[in-house]
Amino acid sequence: MAVYPPLRKVRMSVRTPAKEVGADVRLTELFDTQTADFSPLLAKVKSSGAQYLIVVLSHASSDVFAKQWHDAQVPVPYGGIDVKSMDGDFYSRIGGKAISEVAANFAVRAPLTKKTIPFFDEFKKNSANYPVYTAFFAYDSVYIYAEAVKRAGSFDTDKVIKELEKTKFEGVGGEIVFDEMHDVQTGKGKMNLIFAQWQDKGERAVLYPKELRTGTFILPPWMKK
């Protein structure tokens, strides 16, 4: 396994638990967010013998990284936290060179709930853009707040908070229930971080959680036997 997080603390948060579960971490690297040539890093990955590359890309250019990984036909599939790869047009934007990348996301056109696909399609129809994860949360939050106010029969802050704490709402991405710290609960049927893979024709297949899986993992085309 090779790991390329841009932040030192993130590097340790990935490397330590990976080792704890028995993963063989071959190397970890940091790089400047302005990096335009990833070939030296990709060469290290290739020579490391790693079977999978985990990335954490936020401020760096995901487009450039994916293109160079693809063009070099690096024999190591990759995925992780890649903010720009969460964009619905990422695959088409870089000419399909994101094929097989697995990226964490919340907003994927998949039957996460009965609301997901209708919302996704209506959003695209009305805005000409694909929704990102913030769109899911913003949409749901309006309805959650409105229902809490209705139950409270008031806009009084304390009364509304008490009703918000009772929330059990089927959202676009999963059921929304708050815990005692007012965080959204995760778990089967609830809101979850989804890992989805870019596949042929720009389709995204959900690989995790298992109960939401819509496809199977594929290798980059040049690694297929």
Kindly label every feature range from the protein language model.
Residues 13-21, 44, 48, 56, ...:
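Structured segments of extracytoplasmic/periplasmic soluble domains
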Residues 69-139, 150-153, 209-225:
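Extracellular/periplasmic periplasmic-binding protein-like sensory domains
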Residues 1-3, 81-83, 200:
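Cofactor-binding loop segments of dinucleotide-utilizing enzymes, especially the Rossmann-like FAD-
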Residues 125-135, 146-207:
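Segments of small-molecule ligand-sensing domains
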Residues 25-30, 101-103, 195:
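Conserved beta-strand scaffold positions in the cores of enzyme catalytic domains, especially
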Residues 2-13, 88-89, 136-142:
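Extracytoplasmic ligand-binding site segments that recognize negatively charged/polar headgroups
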Residues 1-73, 109-118:
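Extracellular/periplasmic Venus flytrap/periplasmic-binding protein
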